[in-house]
């Protein structure tokens, strides 16, 4: 099974899925359009969240970063007048330094991730969507900013006028992702932001054409008219999509077979049938590992019946 993932929502699902599906049968394709260089090192937030989850190091209170991390280096730099744009933990920074050193040695992003998977003893295949640079740029009333500036510096407060992925047309799907897609027919789109997390992955040239030939199941990150977490609603509105599970189906309608809704969602199934999308309702609000496991079992069953 191939899982398309961002840094929120999908990691919680993956936490349960790896207990249901053997790790060596899972490939996680991760968004890299939110990556940014900070203090001389490449930060890959979504990839790092997956790495920390699978290595048992994630801070489960925040669902990002390393548990029990400290921030002495960040504080010391601030005291010395270096305005580091992101608050980076000391243990988290180790990963960034190791990856950036590998990149400076000439390794690709996917090759650097392979090295980190080995170091952390991770059996799941984790891949970047592309080895090329793609940047999510958010337009607000005060101008265009990188996604991290919008989300970290501006706390996601400004109105979003538009969202674009800079460099997406020139980027190529990672060759290892293409290999995985050639050998696996099941693609699970996790409950991550459809515009800034999943959007870059499916917007890579040629990806939609490939997905039309696959069994594609998506888990909605929207319950009712609200995102479970993060700024998905703002970005969907900026792109002209309804902030609803129907809007999620609309984002993926070109290739989507089944959309998994939360059982609290009251959207009429007929609205999806008109789009050629089947729906399955279950508990998608993963407040515990057991709920994540139950959802994962349901997803495995859905794929078996497509």
UniProtKB/Swiss-Prot annotation:
Pfam short name (any one): CofD
Required cofactor(s): Mg(2+)
Alphabetical list of SUPFAM superfamilies matching this protein: CofD-like (SSF142338)
GO terms assigned for molecular function: LPPG:FO 2-phospho-L-lactate transferase activity; magnesium ion binding
Pathway: Cofactor biosynthesis; coenzyme F420 biosynthesis
Record keywords: Magnesium, Transferase
EC number: 2.7.8.28
Database matches in InterPro entries: CofD, CofD-like_dom_sf, FbiA/CofD
Catalytic activity: (2S)-lactyl-2-diphospho-5'-guanosine + 7,8-didemethyl-8-hydroxy-5-deazariboflavin = oxidized coenzyme F420-0 + GMP + H(+)
Residue numbers binding 7,8-didemethyl-8-hydroxy-5-deazariboflavin: 48
Biological processes per GO annotation: F420-0 metabolic process
HAMAP family linked to this entry: CofD
Subunit-level organization: Homodimer.
Function: Catalyzes the transfer of the 2-phospholactate moiety from (2S)-lactyl-2-diphospho-5'-guanosine to 7,8-didemethyl-8-hydroxy-5-deazariboflavin (FO) with the formation of oxidized coenzyme F420-0 and GMP.
Family from the record: Belongs to the CofD family.
Protein name as annotated: 2-phospho-L-lactate transferase
Species: Methanococcoides burtonii (strain DSM 6242 / NBRC 107633 / OCM 468 / ACE-M)
Gene name for this UniProt entry: cofD
